[in-house]
Amino acid sequence: MAVPKKRTSISKKRIRRNIWKKRGYWEAKRAFSLAKSISSGRSKSFFVLQKNKQ
């Protein structure tokens, strides 16, 4: 079984965690932006079928 030889420093842990969190932030921002464009009807990359209420 693979075991790390030495303990990872706190600063290295913090850097890696911040990279991980920042990636999540940008993904969430992109998803929210896409949702806003779809809901407002200004989306250029998605075709949403509108159901007619009759």
Swiss-Prot record:
Recorded GO MF terms: structural constituent of ribosome
Superkingdom as given in the UniProt entry: Eukaryota
Keyword terms of this UniProt record: Chloroplast, Plastid, Ribonucleoprotein, Ribosomal protein
Keyword Iron-sulfur: no
Gene Ontology terms describing biological process: translation
Membrane-spanning residues: none
First-listed, main subcellular location of the protein, grouped into a coarse class: plastid
Location(s), subcellular: Plastid, Chloroplast
GO CC terms of this entry: chloroplast; large ribosomal subunit
Family matches, as InterPro entries: Ribosomal_bL32, Ribosomal_bL32_plant/cyanobact, Ribosomal_zn-bd
Coiled coil: none
Recorded family membership: Belongs to the bacterial ribosomal protein bL32 family.
Name of the molecule in the record: Large ribosomal subunit protein bL32c
Species assigned in the record: Piper cenocladum (Ant piper)
Highest classification ranks of the organism: Eukaryota, Viridiplantae, Streptophyta, Embryophyta, Tracheophyta
